[in-house]
From Swiss-Prot:
Residues 59-180 form the PH domain. Pfam families: PH (PF00169). This is PH domain-containing protein DDB_G0267786. SMART domains: PH. SUPFAM superfamilies: PH domain-like. It comes from the Eukaryota.
Length: 528
């Protein structure tokens, strides 16, 4: 790696960490403010089902024998895998669990059901960046049928072999769920988690990277990932093109050595930066929380006033863009995406009915042990989730019009919402019986009515979610340059006493969401 490329990487890393630091401190302050306002206003949830506490059921989610490829000897070994309630995965020599061999945390990973293809695709992609003739590249060794790849580009990858197709399909979904639900953050404070995500988004936006970006892991890993992603986008191609002309295996070896150096440079900068930033916000919170609590009403009123001023001053820029690029497509989009979403939520209610009618316990907490975990089962929830599957191709058809969204993420998020509603439905019935002391028959009727209400609400919410995910990145590329001068003017008008607790960009983001939600609701009402 020459000195110029190395210096570019150092400067980019430094600039991104500086941007993230500023964005995170601001976002963390805003999240504490939001929490204080929410606590003071005691705004009720629109959903009627009780949200299931994360640790309500600590029983294992799933288990079974699989064959795992060893990291060092590269031999296939039979192991007993256990998915814990927090979606970490332990694996043992056998099902007696006396000899634990390791733990896998899949936060930030992806699941590939055809590792032979995905592995070759990655090699070809790298070869193209290095200017290598792809016809000269030897194909990698073929993995056995029913092999699953648990992939991360900068962490250890896992290769898991299943016994048959049915087992393969089941574990694919289990591993995908673990990727989505396992927690990588070391700091579990909700304000921190929300602020971190906003800071990641805003850091990427500051570089003009408007599209969807999936991430996961602990704080250091995520910060390293977003920097490495930008290095790959902006610098890596030029660095790889400067490698000496040589056979593929030599160039690939040099490329891997280069990536090891780059990853080391980034991680060595990220670790102390995050340690210092984390300490700063820990010291900040006890100082600002009392100030926020004393000014909840003025802050909330100022936020409302600013959003109203934004709407008044910016609609002349936003409305034409909505008419030209969004509104003319909404009726068709909603008409097409509505059926699979409705069907998915409706099917989840049918499953709840079946499982609830099958419950014949005595109403004790212990009698619900099997019932409360029914949403864990892939095959039990499959009929509801499968109803969402047609949505993927529908959403993909709009890529020529809207870009920078993930059809996979959209579909998977809705499937997760359906599954979470099933958890809440099971928990609500159990709580109504065991804590509220309502008889089982009456509790079933009460919970059924709540579930019906939430199915309608959940469908509506997910329609709006899909529209936002598809449309917003493209819309923001158009309207942000037009609205930026007005944002700057409004920002300068915020009273200094509460300026630290108001993020003009987040309020603008809320305004855009509100506009898209309102437009979507108009079409939903027309179609009803």
């Amino acid at each position: 790696m020459d000195a110029q490329i190395k210096n570019e990487i150092v400067e980019l890393t430094k600039a991104m960490l500086e941007t993230f630091t500023k964005e995170y401190i601001k976002a963390y302050t805003i999240q504490i403010t939001k929490k204080a306002i929410k606590d003071a206003k005691a705004i009720p949830s629109p959903y009627l089902l009780e949200p299931r506490p994360r640790d309500h059921d600590k029983s294992d989610v799933f288990s079974g024998y699989l064959v795992k490829l060893g990291a060092i000897r590269k031999n296939w070994l039979k192991r007993h895998f256990v998915v814990r309630y927090d979606y970490s995965i332990d694996y043992f020599v056998d099902d007696k669990h006396t000899n634990k061999k390791g733990t896998i945390n899949l936060c930030g990973y992806s699941v590939n059901d055809d590792p032979n293809k995905s592995g070759l695709d990655r090699i070809l992609k790298i070869a193209e960046k290095m200017g290598v003739d792809t016809s000269s590249i030897p194909k990698p060794a073929q993995l056995p049928p029913f092999t699953i790849e648990l992939y991360h580009y900068s962490r250890r990858c896992y290769y898991i072999q299943c016994a048959n197709e049915e087992e393969f399909k089941e574990w694919i979904e289990i591993f995908k769920t673990c990727c989505r639900r396992s927690h990588g953050f070391k700091n579990k404070d909700p304000c921190h988690i929300a602020a971190f995500g906003i800071a990641v988004r805003n850091t990427r936006w500051s570089l003009g990277r408007w599209g969807w970006f999936g991430y996961g892991g602990n704080e250091n890993q995520i910060l390293s990932d977003i920097i490495l992603d930008e290095i790959e986008y902006d610098i890596l191609g030029r660095a790889l093109s400067k490698l000496p002309n040589a056979p593929w295996f030599i160039r690939n070896y040099l490329r891997n050595k280069m990536m090891t150096v780059i990853e080391g440079m980034v991680s060595s900068a990220v670790a102390p930066a995050w340690t210092g930033l984390s300490k700063t916000v820990e010291e900040l919170r006890p100082t600002i929380e009392p100030r926020i609590k004393n000014q909840v009403d003025p802050i909330a009123q100022a936020q409302t006033n600013i959003i109203n001023k934004m709407r008044e001053s910016m609609m002349s820029q936003i409305k034409p863009a909505m008419e030209e690029h969004v509104n003319k497509h909404l009726k068709k989009i909603i008409g097409e995406i509505r059926t699979p979403i409705e069907n998915g939520f409706d099917e989840s209610l049918k499953i709840w009915n079946e499982k609830t009618n099958a419950y014949n316990g005595n109403g004790s907490t212990e009698s619900f042990s099997s019932y409360r975990s029914y949403p864990n089962s892939y095959w039990t929830m499959y009929p509801a989730k499968d109803k969402i599957s047609p949505l993927y191709s529908i959403v993909e058809e709009y890529r020529p019009i809207f870009r920078d969204y993930s059809s996979y993420f959209i579909c998977y998020d809705i499937k997760e919402s359906i599954n979470n509603m099933a958890y809440d439905g099971a928990y609500t019935l159990e709580k109504t019986v065991t804590q509220d002391q309502v008889d089982v028959a009456s509790a079933k009727n009460q919970t059924h009515s709540k579930y019906q209400h939430d199915v309608i609400l959940g469908t509506n919410m997910q329609l709006k979610f899909v529209v936002r995910e598809m449309v917003k990145p493209t819309l923001c590329k158009i309207i942000n340059p037009l609205t930026k001068p007005l944002l700057n003017t409004l920002s300068s008008s915020i009273p200094s006493a509460i300026g630290d607790f108001i993020d003009i960009n987040e309020l603008y983001n809320q305004l855009v969401d509100d506009i898209l939600n309102d437009s979507t609701q108009v079409v939903i009402d027309e179609l009803n």
